[in-house]
Amino acid sequence: MEKDRNVKKRVITAGTFDILHPGHYEILKFAKSLGDELIVIIARDKTVERLKGRKPIIPENQRREMVEALKPVDKAILGSLNNKLEPILKLKPDIIVLGPDQMTFDEETLKKELEKHNLHPKIVRFKNYKKCPFHSSFDIVKEIVKRYCNKE
């Protein structure tokens, strides 16, 4: 994807976004505040299964559609099955926002990998998400199991 000349700053972030919760929305609002265009890379089902040892609950295309429907998001795309850097190399972002628990890359490793491709985006780690009872998809699933599956 070529950069649109009218876009001043392209921001990207990536994640699974399996069961949407306030933490997801907070990072998306933050990411959008850093630029003019926010593109979100949605992890593929097979990638999530490989990294987390379990399939996402919501299929990848539905997750992409839901994220793209959120106000801060200009576009959501599916990530690559083969190379996690591929969409970043195509999008050529000015800023990359990493989530607080996103450990696929640390900032320095990502920076060095992108420099090999002559890309020099600013890399920002989002740290100040709103604390709330269910700020992770895993916590939501645990609560559902507790409330509905442990009944006699």
Swiss-Prot record:
Residues holding ATP: 16-17, 21-24, 101, 129
Enzyme class: transferase
Domain of life: Archaea
Family (UniProt): Belongs to the archaeal FAD synthase family.
Gene3D superfamilies linked: HUPs
Functional pathway: Cofactor biosynthesis; FAD biosynthesis; FAD from FMN: step 1/1
TM regions (residue ranges): none
Role summary: Catalyzes the transfer of the AMP portion of ATP to flavin mononucleotide (FMN) to produce flavin adenine dinucleotide (FAD) coenzyme.
Encoding gene, per UniProt annotation: ribL
Species of origin: Methanocaldococcus vulcanius (strain ATCC 700851 / DSM 12094 / M7)
Subunit architecture: Homodimer.
This enzyme's EC code(s): 2.7.7.2
GO MF: ATP binding; FMN adenylyltransferase activity
Protein's name according to its UniProt entry: FAD synthase
Catalysed reactions, as listed in the record: FMN + ATP + H(+) = FAD + diphosphate
Record keywords, A-Z: ATP-binding, FAD, Flavoprotein, FMN, Nucleotide-binding, Nucleotidyltransferase, Transferase
One biological process term in Gene Ontology: FAD biosynthetic process
Cofactor(s) listed in the protein's UniProt record: a divalent metal cation
